[in-house]
Amino acid sequence: MQIYQEMSSPEHYIRANELLTMEWDDFDDYYRKYGSENNPEAYALRCSMWYRLNGVGLLVKADLLDVDRVYDLIGGTILSQWAKWRDIIIWIREEWSIPGYLEGFEFIADEMVKESESRGYAADVPESLHRYVPKEKGGT
């Protein structure tokens, strides 16, 4: 329940929104804007979210949390954060040779996709979720 309380706080939503609205053109641009040396605040914000969701995934994997309850409580957060950060996390794994980096986060994201689909919902997160994308460019 402590995880839910933290992830339902106003501060969580401020942090989640800030993370989801970060933009970059490529990995160099990302690192220039948000890398730990250049922007320690963004680094701390990102790691706080990533490691929390990684922990949720590890708890589910160890059968200490129930997948459907996690989905009901924070499934949207998991899906949107993974959609935003997947490529960066995979790049970090490859660039720094740490293949298991945040595997709990990836695990729980995959489980949230399965749970969405089992309920008959789409699991895709639209690119326009946290920024305006005109309809002619694929927005809603």
PLM-predicted stretches and their roles:
Residues 1-140:
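Amphipathic alpha-helical "stem/stalk" segments
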